């Protein structure tokens, strides 16, 4: 569904080019949950912005369904990729229904008027994340976990085959982090969504993810199943320059001792 070919991401400022990650060859398929792991500030958000079309690649190709990302119009992309942001300041003055309805913008035309089918999709999206009882509540009154579910419902209402989330469990308490990850896993399977998320919740994400994209210290990205990345030592070497190592017995990183 989504793949990259020798992708290099970073920034241009006039003639100055800053490379963040390079030669990336990874894929994302329908029905799977993939977690993007790596150290803070290593380029995970830059990669997500690039493969979602928000930021231009420095070189290489991002393809969706075998077609170059640059060949799609912005409207076409809005029907292919839904993006869930972590910013807690967004949409506080809207009700849950109004927020989720924004996901229908690619289909509602210039004036944004929803018809019966649009309202049906919105209702189904809210139900899918277990928020029907909060439909008319203002987003500002929701807990962080409820707000994240509402944002996921907005992406579902957009009816895209791909959903990308940048740190969806940031700011959440333990129970909400677990609920959010379990929800994303269930949506990937039941609705055959291709879901990609970045996260620091290693211990929580590993049991639920289908595959990993690991950003290494040498600015490359390695993909594979947990079993593959444990067997070849990639997970253990992820933070090789730090005093931590991967412990496969607890599926998390521990301080070396």
Residue ranges, per PLM feature:
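The feature captures the beta-strand-to-loop junction immediately N-terminal to the Walker
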Residues: 37-39
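Helix-to-loop junction immediately C-terminal to a conserved catalytic motif
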Residues: 52
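Conserved ABC transporter NBD signature motif
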Residues: 60-68, 77
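Conserved ABC ATPase "signature" region
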Residues: 101, 116-134
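Conserved ABC ATPase signature
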Residues: 138-142
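Catalytic Walker B motif of ABC-type/P-loop ATPase nucleotide-binding domains
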Residues: 163-166
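ABC ATPase nucleotide-binding domains
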Residues: 239-257
């Amino acid at each position: 569904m989504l793949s990259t070919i020798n992708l290099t991401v970073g920034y241009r400022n006039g003639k100055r080019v800053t490379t963040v990650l390079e030669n990336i060859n990874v894929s994302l398929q329908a029905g799977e949950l993939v977690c993007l792991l790596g150290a803070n500030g290593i380029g995970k958000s830059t990669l997500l912005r690039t493969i979602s079309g928000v930021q231009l690649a420095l070189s290489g190709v991002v393809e969706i369904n075998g077609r170059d990302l640059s060949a799609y119009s912005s409207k076409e992309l809005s029907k292919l990729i839904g993006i869930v942001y972590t910013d807690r300041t967004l949409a506080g003055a809207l009700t849950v229904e109004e927020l989720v309805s924004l996901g229908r913008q690619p289909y509602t035309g210039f004036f944004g008027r929803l018809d019966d089918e649009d309202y049906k999709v919105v209702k189904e999206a809210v139900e899918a994340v277990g928020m029907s009882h909060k439909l008319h509540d203002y987003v500002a009154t929701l807990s962080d976990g409820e707000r994240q579910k509402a944002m996921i419902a907005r992406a579902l209402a957009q009816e895209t085959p791909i959903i990308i989330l940048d740190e969806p469990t940031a700011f959440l308490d333990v129970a909400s982090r677990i609920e959010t990850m379990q929800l994303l896993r269930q949506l990937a399977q039941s609705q055959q969504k291709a879901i990609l998320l970045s996260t620091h919740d290693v211990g929580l994400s590993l049991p639920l993810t289908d595959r990993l994209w690991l950003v290494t210290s040498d600015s490359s990205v390695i993909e594979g199943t947990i079993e593959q990345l444990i067997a070849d030592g990639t997970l253990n070497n992820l933070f090789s320059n730090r005093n931590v190592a991967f412990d496969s017995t607890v599926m998390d990183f521990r301080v070396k001792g």
